[in-house]
Amino acid sequence: MSVPGAGPAPRSRLLLGLAAGAVAFAAADTYVVVLALVDMMQGIGLSPEQLQRAAPIVSGFLLGYVAMLPLIGRIADLRGRVPVLTAALIVFAFGSILTAAAYDMTTMVGGRFLQGVGGGGLVPATLALVADLYPAHRRAIPLGIVSAVQEIGSVLGPLLGAVVLAVADWRAIFLLNLAVGLVLAAAIAAAASREGVAGRGASAASHETASPRVVEQRGAPATSGPPPVVEQRGAPATSGPP
């Protein structure tokens, strides 16, 4: 375990790195479908001329993502950071397989919504994990990194989609999500078990960061981008998917 006032142990850094990677991957899924929308519509029997009907495929994800932000902080305080992170990844993976198997718009949008619910749960739980692993005066950099990887994931989403579409069909995007989500969930659980990080808010400071809305820290600029995640003492502003 970490010595009070010092940085986290190497295994704790690994745990935080895995959580940040999960945040980036989920953020990428916001717009990973942009280049696949026409193929996805054809997969459920809609023509390219009905492209306007594809909007819920993107907005369904965003709705689930934003809906979870005010709720997960408190749940992470009560149930623990790692259980919430792994549960969020499992929900994300389930939404991915539901989307991959979809043959109508309702099922597809439902799957995307569940992906958003899982992805939205990762952000506050990861911020709370930072508060557990780092003393207050050393949180600016790790919190900034979490915000940065979220933004990077959102930007790289369409590129990831293009790479997958170059070698497979649109359903492969969501099968990849399924595999990565389950692998990250298992890796986070294993890393937490080896380090002994379980997590029900270790301090008042961690409760602050876990709470739904995260705010700009003194001296740390707020990040811009997708739906803002929040303001609260002790953490820099972060954001949801664009």
Predicted regions, residues:
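Hydrophobic transmembrane-helix bundles of small-molecule transporters
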Residues: A166-P242
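Conserved MFS/SLC helix-loop-helix module at the cytosolic interface between two early adjacent transmembrane helices
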Residues: A67-M105
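Cytoplasmic helix-loop-helix junction between adjacent transmembrane helices
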Residues: L114-A148
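Helix-breaking motifs and short loop linkers at transmembrane-helix boundaries and internal kinks
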Residues: G43-G45, G80, A101-T107, P135, ...
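Cytosolic juxtamembrane N-terminal segment immediately preceding the first transmembrane helix
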Residues: M1-A28, V33
